[in-house]
């Protein structure tokens, strides 16, 4: 989770997801601070990676973007939507994705895969209910703008999904 692509964005992401936020940590950010760190990392990614690529008229593919912040922070964790919307509006300007692919997953299977991961971060430890809320949020976002979103069944072979996207 979280924006990547620049050293600064990576450092912010690591601050959010890595070990000192585990259950035994004495230092925890509140939800707004957590979200603002994600948004700061996203801004860095936009300024240093996306805007230069857009200027050069390159095709851009992002692993996660603004919909992830809405799904995870707003719908999953209950962060104030107007806060996220305001910051997104400020940092994005007129930038918006042309297409978004959402991979619909079987939550139980996804949780099993997370359980088997060798290196975990705090997002790997959230409840099934959290992931149900996040997936429902992605699907809700997709329903609102069906021209931009494509929901794909992630239970299919990854080669089939790749061919569908391409």
PLM regions: where:
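Residue-level recognition of specific faces of alpha-helices
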Residues: 37, 83-86, 99, 130, ...
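ATP-dependent small-molecule kinase phosphotransfer cores
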Residues: 2-92
């Amino acid at each position: 989770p979280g924006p990547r692509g620049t050293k600064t964005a990576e450092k912010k992401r690591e601050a959010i997801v890595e070990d000192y936020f585990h259950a035994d940590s004495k230092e925890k950010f509140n939800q707004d601070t957590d979200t603002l760190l994600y948004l700061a990392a996203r801004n860095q990614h936009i300024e240093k990676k996306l805007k230069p690529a857009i200027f050069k008229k390159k095709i851009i593919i992002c692993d996660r973007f603004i919909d992830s912040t809405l799904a995870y922070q707003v719908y999953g964790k209950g962060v104030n939507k107007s806060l996220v919307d305001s910051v997104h509006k400020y940092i994005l300007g007129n930038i918006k994705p042309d297409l978004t692919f959402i991979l619909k997953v079987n939550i139980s299977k996804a949780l099993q895969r997370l359980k088997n991961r060798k290196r975990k971060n705090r997002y790997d430890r959230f409840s099934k209910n959290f992931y149900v809320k996040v997936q429902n949020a992605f699907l809700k976002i997709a329903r609102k703008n069906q021209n931009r979103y494509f929901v794909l069944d992630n239970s299919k072979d990854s080669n089939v999904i790749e061919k569908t996207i391409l």
